[in-house]
Swiss-Prot record:
Molecular function in Gene Ontology: RNA binding
Presence of the UniProt keyword Protease in the record: no
Transmembrane segments: none
Protein's UniProt name: Pentatricopeptide repeat-containing protein At1g09190
Gene: PCMP-E70
Organism from which the protein derives: Arabidopsis thaliana
PANTHER family given in the database record: PENTATRICOPEPTIDE REPEAT-CONTAINING PROTEIN
Gene Ontology biological process terms in this record: RNA modification
């Protein structure tokens, strides 16, 4: 018994991750490989350390695993994945004639919630009803999570209504479920019914309102949360800062900044620092964004990307390019596809075509990143803005991806600025082909012909618009122009 207690203490010690093989060896040396209790603990620790391979190897040598061991394996795969393995162990347990208990079903339901196919979950729910475990509160919470994660809010509501006691966890699941399925009003109604709310409840509701374009209501809810004495956490900060920037409510954003500094959130979470950099970039204060960036003790690729892109948006492309160079020179963080989109935008705003071409090649050759449609679009925009419209056109025609409306729009705008009517006509006609239902493109083409006095062509465009039952409407094209 003493050796078992010692091994249990070792399993729950501070250095367990590095000592798993040593602890396992102790277990074998003292002939405890038949102790299902110890083995279940060992497998549970493997799961908490995301080491499912080791757990599986240990399980494969157990001659007579009991429900404790199977529960540990089911929980291990519910934590680490793949979730289908949990169901496999559940099936194996049943085939051996081992009865499941209440500790079997909670992780099993969690695994079912992770699967996109609800059929498995419904089978488990049926099993729960047959065995009577569905009456247990924590099991019902798992069933609610199963249905909310699968968007089956009717089924979730039925289980929720049957619960005599509902804790904050199940309320949060229902609110998030309704909001994620598009019924924000229902989610808000439930939120207002809650007698006790957690910070998770507030964050879920604020985020859901913002996602459906109701930023003003989201901010009002945040203010109500503060008035009720809740302190913002990481998720609150990351959610509310973009809302503050979108609404132009700088005082709120600065208050959140101050709170994040004093509470330690800024120090503890890279995401908070990134959100602050983004907030100040979107608010037009690149100096404050840079100060936050430099103050961050740890930075990831998002940190660099946010400030590089923010430099372009704020008309400081040169600074953004220098920042990119510093990132590469430092070498701690590798750039990704978004990094190059940001720095190419910086090149575009500063007219540095050659540097942009160099970076475009660097992305694929040195960093082995695949150029996406957005990167080709950035190159077209770079050449077009710099007046190198013939190069831009050749690039468009020879690139391996299909040109989209934004690319042809960039070229068209540049052609009109530089008086290249012939190429402008080609670009406008391509826009009409890509977006035949966008009346703004027809108006652009018609105006081009009108400026050249080609009235027969103007009439052809108008006839085509009538044929396609299109009317002139403002704001449909990304290119500004006078109407026909």
């Amino acid at each position: 018994m003493e050796i078992e207690r010692k091994l249990l203490r070792l399993l729950h010690g501070h250095n367990t991750r590095t000592r798993l093989p040593e602890i396992h060896a102790h277990l074998l040396r003292h002939f405890l490989h038949g102790s299902n209790l110890l083995l279940a603990h060992f497998i549970s620790i493997c799961g908490s350390l995301s080491n499912s391979d080791y757990a599986n190897r240990v399980f494969s040598h157990i001659q007579n695993p009991n429900v404790l061991v199977f529960n540990a394996m089911i929980k291990c795969y519910s934590l680490v994945g793949p979730p289908l393995e949990s169901l496999s162990f559940f099936s194996s347990m049943k085939s051996r004639g081992i009865w499941a208990d209440e500790y079997t079903y909670a992780p099993l339901l969690k695994s079912c919630s992770s699967l996109s196919d609800l059929r498995f979950g419904k089978c488990v729910h049926g099993e729960l009803i047959r065995t009577g475990f569905h009456r247990l509160g924590k099991i019902r919470i798992g069933v609610v999570e199963l249905y909310t994660s699968g968007g089956r809010m009717g089924d979730a509501q039925k289980v929720f209504d049957e619960m005599s006691e509902r804790n904050v966890v199940v309320w949060n699941l229902m609110i998030r479920g309704f909001c994620d399925s598009g019924d924000v009003e229902r989610g808000l109604h439930l939120f207002k019914q809650m007698s006790e709310r957690s910070i998770v409840s507030w964050n879920s509701m604020i985020s859901s309102l913002s996602k459906c374009g109701r930023d003003r209501e989201a901010l009002e809810l945040f203010c109500e949360m503060i008035d009720q004495g809740f302190d913002p956490d990481e998720a609150t900060v990351v959610t509310v800062l973009p809302i503050s920037a979108s609404l132009g409510v700088l005082d709120t954003g600065k208050w959140i900044h101050s709170t994040a500094e004093s509470s330690g959130l800024f120090k503890d979470f890279i995401t908070v620092g990134n959100a602050l950099v983004d907030f100040y970039c979107k608010s037009g204060d690149l100096e404050a964004a840079t100060a936050i960036f430099r103050k961050m003790q740890r930075r990831n690729v998002v940190s660099w990307n946010t400030l590089i892109s923010g430099s372009a948006v704020n008309g400081k492309g040169e600074f953004g390019i220098d920042l990119f160079d510093a990132m590469i020179e430092e070498g701690k963080v590798a750039p990704n596809e978004a990094t190059f989109l940001g720095v190419l935008a910086c090149c575009s705003y500063t007219g540095q075509v050659e540097r942009g071409e160099e970076l475009f090649g660097l992305m694929m050759e040195r960093f082995k990143l695949e150029a996406r449609t957005e990167h080709y679009g950035a190159m077209v925009d770079l050449m077009s803005r710099s007046g190198r419209i013939t190069e831009a056109f050749k690039f468009l025609k020879n690139m391996p991806v299909n040109a989209n409306a934004a690319m042809w729009g960039s070229l068209l705008s540049a052609c009109r600025s530089h008086g290249d009517v012939k190429l402008a006509e080609v670009a406008a006609m391509e826009l009409v082909k890509i977006e035949p239902g966008n009346s703004g493109n027809y108006v652009l083409l018609s105006n081009l012909y009108a400026e050249e006095g080609r009235w027969q062509d103007v009439e052809k465009v108008r006839t085509l618009m009538k044929k396609n039952r299109l009317r002139k409407s403002t704001g449909q094209s990304t290119i500004c122009d006078v109407s026909v």
